[in-house]
């Protein structure tokens, strides 16, 4: 084997992108079809079984604001390392906060 570090999208995410046994199975349709309004606060909680519109795992657990909609996904603005970021995230990976 070659001692070379992997550089893929899902590297170092064994715990972050895995579910506990009781949470496994099909994703509920209500989670996929959630609706959000502009200026809603949302948390990015990646759903590992739904790959469409998945943000990079470095943003897992962060809170942002919905700015708009792009197709089936939402534009979420958040601050990361002192910079404003605009992520395009599917609603399966979002949870409303407060």
UniProtKB/Swiss-Prot annotation:
GO terms for cellular component: ribonucleoprotein complex; ribosome
Coiled-coil stretches noted in the UniProt entry, renumbered to this chain: none
UniProt-listed GO biological process terms: translation
MF GO annotations: structural constituent of ribosome
Region (Disordered): 1-23
Taxonomy, superkingdom: Archaea
Keywords: Ribonucleoprotein, Ribosomal protein
Basic residues composition-biased segments: 7-23
Pfam families noted in UniProt: Ribosomal_L21e
Entry's family note: Belongs to the eukaryotic ribosomal protein eL21 family.
NCBIfam families (UniProt xref): PRK04306.1
Name of the molecule in the record: Large ribosomal subunit protein eL21
Organism field: Nanoarchaeum equitans (strain Kin4-M)
């Amino acid at each position: 084997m070659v001692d070379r570090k992997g550089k893929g999208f899902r590297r170092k995410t064994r715990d972050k992108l895995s579910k506990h046994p009781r949470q496994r199975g099909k994703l509920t349709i209500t989670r996929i079809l959630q609706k959000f309004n502009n200026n809603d606060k949302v948390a990015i909680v990646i759903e590992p079984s739904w790959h469409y519109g998945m943000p990079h795992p470095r943003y897992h657990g962060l809170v942002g604001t919905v700015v708009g909609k792009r197709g089936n996904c939402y534009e979420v603005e958040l601050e990361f390392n002192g910079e404003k970021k605009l992520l395009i995230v599917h609603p399966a990976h979002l949870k409303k906060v407060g």
